[in-house]
Design a protein with these regions (language model features):
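Formylglycine-dependent sulfatase
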Residues: 1-425, 431-433, 444-465, 493-505
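Short hydrophobic beta-strand that contains or immediately precedes a catalytic carboxylate
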Residues: 437-438
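Residues forming the ATP-binding cleft of Hanks-type serine/threonine protein kinase domains
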Residues: 441
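A contiguous, mid-protein "functional segment" used to position or interact
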Residues: 454-483
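Short, charged, surface-exposed hinge/linker loops at domain edges
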Residues: 476-496
Length: 505
């Protein structure tokens, strides 16, 4: 069989247990579940980062964030042009490449954003195209598409919809982290992305090698689900929230302020006094119905995309579905990713259908999102660059799975080995350093911080030594905040934007 066409489908901030093939009872993903019936379902897949940009740059390069420098959504962490990436390496093999939807390979200059105005985005678009995409339909996150003129925002503007969408997302006082999408469903960002992908697939030639990345920005907040999809979700079939009333009495935990307030993380921003403890149970029901409704919308488009790809390419098709990271989804009474290192955020769905595969398999071995870069390149007949920190999924499974997992973002890192995880964060501006340990064998829901339990002293030494064996990790993740000002990307005016690599003229 010739080199396969490759369809890479990703979502943003999707909890593992939103798919029935991963045990969800809400029944919102019939198309993905049908794919899983004839594919490899990886039961223990972890993201390399609990936030968007580092996770996505790892898809592109197969590198740990502390090796690529892409460690944050907000610091000097753009995807460098010096590293070979999926697009550049596949193009060398004759592939036509495309991305439809969210890139987020460059930190957004958040201080420059305005709720009442959409700003130009051409420097982002130019940079993305330097990464090797032959075709780009950019819908660069639900918020970014209202702050900046990407392709989706331009389409909203042409149809007179942009101002209303911007108001609902950023100015409407009734927006509490969720709202009903104010226009017809085809203009919802995830439907828009799905339609662009289908149109592109239908225009392709089956005689060419094609790599198409469909990158949905949902179900990431704001949860802007069309009412027709929210109405499909029976609150009595929602996954039960996992929480304990007294779990945040322990102030040794990193997210204690997010719960008690005033927190600065996503879910806290919509809560009274910045405290997520103030959300009522009805709030959680309404937020979660819309979250699952957004997933139902995406699933429909996944079905349409798969139908189009199979009609065009037949069985010579590699399909990979995953998410950049998970979502708290009300567990531990938090929503958002929050830079959290709970399993809710670190575990990701991963479904892989090889060309011609007709039977489903459950793969229990532990793998990382680092494995996707070498897997895709190897299937395309491309050599894997030496910089890659992962190996193919098949190789990792043959080795018995990853012996340990590291996941990181700009100020936090976690290491997981033998079901025990140790978490560290850089000392914050008040000098507080949170350290946490959870034993998933005894405490699978992660309620009890056992870092100071003497029974785990040896485990802490072992896992800390593994982290210290990564000097770049210790430098980038644990650099004191006082040293961080020189790599903040924006001076607050939008003029101080700096790239990690060459800036396009």
């Amino acid at each position: 069989m010739s080199r396969p066409n490759i369809l890479f489908i990703t979502t943003d901030e999707q909890h593992l247990r939103t798919l029935s093939c991963y045990g969800c009872r809400t029944e919102t993903t019939p198309c993905l579940d049908a794919l899983a019936d004839n594919a490899d379902v990886y039961e223990t897949a972890y993201t390399v980062s609990p936030v968007c940009l580092p996770a996505r740059c790892a898809f592109m390069t197969g590198m740990y964030p502390h090796h690529s420098g892409s460690i944050s959504n907000i610091f000097g962490a753009s995807l460098s042009l010096q590293f070979p990436n999926l697009f550049t390496e596949l193009k060398k093999q004759g592939y036509r490449t495309a991305l439809h939807g969210k890139c987020h390979f460059i930190p957004v200059p958040y201080p420059a954003t305005r709720g009442d105005m959409t700003l130009e985005y051409e420097h982002f678009i130019a940079y993305y195209k330097l990464l090797g995409m032959d075709k780009l339909s950019l819908q660069d996150d639900k918020n970014n598409s209202l702050w900046y003129y990407d392709d989706y925002a331009k389409d909203l503007a042409r149809q007179g919809m942009l101002r209303k969408c911007r108001y609902e997302a950023h100015e409407n006082p009734e927006n509490h982290g969720y709202y009903d999408f104010p226009f017809e469903t085809p203009m919802h960002p995830d439907a828009w992305v799905g339609q662009r992908a289908v149109e592109d697939i239908e225009s392709r030639s089956a005689d060419e090698n094609n790599f198409i990345w469909v990158s949905f920005s949902g179900p990431h907040y704001p949860v802007d689900t069309p009412a027709e999809y929210t109405d499909r979700i029976d609150e009595n079939k929602l996954e039960p929230r996992i929480f304990r009333e007294d779990e945040w009495d322990d102030d040794s935990k990193y997210h204690v302020r997010g719960y008690h307030g005033p927190g600065t993380t996503e879910g806290s921003g919509h809560a009274k006094d910045g405290a997520q403890k103030n959300y009522s149970e009805d709030y959680w029901i309404q937020w979660r119905r819309r979250y699952f409704g957004n997933i139902a919308l995406i699933d429909e488009w996944v079905g349409k995309i798969l139908d189009a790809a199979r009609a065009k390419f037949g069985e010579n098709l590699l399909v990979i579905f995953t998410a950049d990271h998970g979502e708290m989804m009300g567990n531990h009474s938090l929503w958002g990713k929050n830079g959290a290192l709970f399993e809710d955020v670190l575990r990701i769905p991963l479904i892989v259908q090889r060309p011609g595969q007709k039977e489903g398999r459950r793969i229990p071995e532990t793998v990382s999102s680092l494995e996707l870069f070498p897997t895709i390149l190897t299937c395309a007949g491309a050599p894997v660059p030496d910089h890659a920190d992962g190996v193919t999924l098949d190789e990792m499974v043959q080795q018995g799975g990853r012996p340990f997992i590291i996941s990181e973002c700009d100020n936090r890192a976690v290491i997981l080995k033998d079901s025990v995880k140790v978490e560290y964060n850089r000392p914050n501006l008040r000098g507080k350093m949170y350290r946490e340990l959870y034993d998933l064998r005894e405490d699978p829901d992660e309620f009890e911080n056992r870092f100071d339990d003497p029974r785990y002293a040896g485990t802490i030494r072992e896992l800390t030594a593994l982290l210290e064996a990564e000097p770049d990790l210790m430098e980038t993740v644990f650099r004191p905040y006082a040293d961080g000002g020189d790599y903040w990307l924006n001076d607050g005016t939008g003029a101080g934007f700096a790239f990690n690599g060459a800036k396009p003229e």
